[in-house]
Amino acid sequence: MFIYDTKSKQKVPFEPLVEKKANIYVCGPTVYDDAHLGHARSAIAFDLLRRTLELSGYEVMLVRNFTDIDDKIINKAFKENKSIQELSSVYIESYTRDLNALNVKKPSLEPKASEYLDAMVRMIETLLEKNIAYRVSNGDIYLDTTKDKDYGSLSVHNSSMEFSRIGLVQEKRLEQDFVLWKSYKGDNDVGFDSPLGKGRPGWHIECSSMVFETLALANAPYQIDIHAGGADLLFPHHENEACQTRCAFGVELAKYWMHNGFVNINNEKMSKSLGNSFFIKDALKNYDGEILRNYLLGVHYRSVLNFNEEDLLVSKKRLDKIYRLKQRVSGTLGGINPNFKKEILECMQDDLNVSKALSVLESMLSSTNEKLDQNPKNKALKGEILANLKFIEELLGIGFKDPSAYFQLGVSESEKQEIENKIEERKRAKEQKDFLKADSIREELLNHKIALMDTPQGTIWEKLF
């Protein structure tokens, strides 16, 4: 297995801390709003990583957190006259629904920052004891980044650009020093009683503490195999996580860092500040979750994905081919084609080279359709095809529906009954040799984007996009 490590900026062999075990931490959402397509892409990218590792024989522990203590959450909660727990729980449920619709496997653990305050306080106390952290007059605690000679080694950031965005806080020693603990400021603030005084943790200390508390190993209590997230988290979030871990415990937080690329809308980075966020729940109103997943995984995870509906519909044709083949076969699951399994898995083991994997898939779909044309009753062939498709379902998370359900997506139960009635009416017309009426019914349904197909088993139908 080879992965691209952001820190070393090269593709490297994956050599976990414990043989054939992989522990992965993926930065999850700050739950103050609904999740957008950027969140979806990150979740799908590292779901593919997990699936690939599992099918390669690794035991995977994947943790994805919820940041439920944050300025944005506090501000919105006060505006809506809610507690931060009430507000965050709404968006945690929304995020979970969205990812279920995208067929993202449930993480091994989903910790909330609010559940690990004691661990955060202990880590800050360690940094204070080592004289690496300092307190300013308003009670806030910052980390002195000059104490970390490797600061900036992960992101190699443009400091003048990034720090001007962060802004200078009075009494900070340097602009890049970052907050570990925010003291309670009174009205319209949230604070927790602690040995550090009443207050709340900074964003970066939250994730580091959750990493150690959920993924600690006996031989590496402060290091994990892979820390992953969106490219927008590289600086300052991941840089600061790595920094405070080195300062507190003298080790690198992760052996490998992985980052997925941005999602652009009309060639512009999607962000709430630009007002061009595309929420997952809104996309799901127009497209089934499997169709969205298929589209979002079709571009290599490190590349920028420029979202547009034309490309989405083109990518849907790949799903159509999977289900067309699935429609042709039934029976008992057979043995997978070993060459197909080896070839497609090797593609994914090469830093999730999904483009190459999809090319292998397309080739398999074409060749097996040809074999079926020549041997339509070959049970062994059908069993092999079913096994191949089952492996695709496990590896890529697509192709898991019944074909009739897939081709009838977006049609209500009452509409289905109306269509079946029309099909029955057409059948009677054909029996009575009234082919003009039969053709008229077909055209009527086609005008409503319902296509009829006559097969030896009877007439079937599907919804056109």
Swiss-Prot record:
One GO cellular component term noted in the UniProt record for this chain: cytosol
Required co-factors: Zn(2+)
EC identifiers of the protein: 6.1.1.16
Motif ('HIGH' region): 29-39
GO molecular function per UniProt: ATP binding; cysteine-tRNA ligase activity; zinc ion binding
SMART domains in alphabetical order: DALR_2
Record: residues binding ATP: K272
Subcellular location: Cytoplasm
Domain of life, source organism: Bacteria
Cofactor remark from the record: Binds 1 zinc ion per subunit.
Residues spanned by motif 'KMSKS' region: 269-273
Catalytic reactions of this protein: tRNA(Cys) + L-cysteine + ATP = L-cysteinyl-tRNA(Cys) + AMP + diphosphate
NCBIfam families hit by this protein: cysS
Subunit architecture: Monomer.
Similarity annotation: Belongs to the class-I aminoacyl-tRNA synthetase family.
Name of protein: Cysteine--tRNA ligase
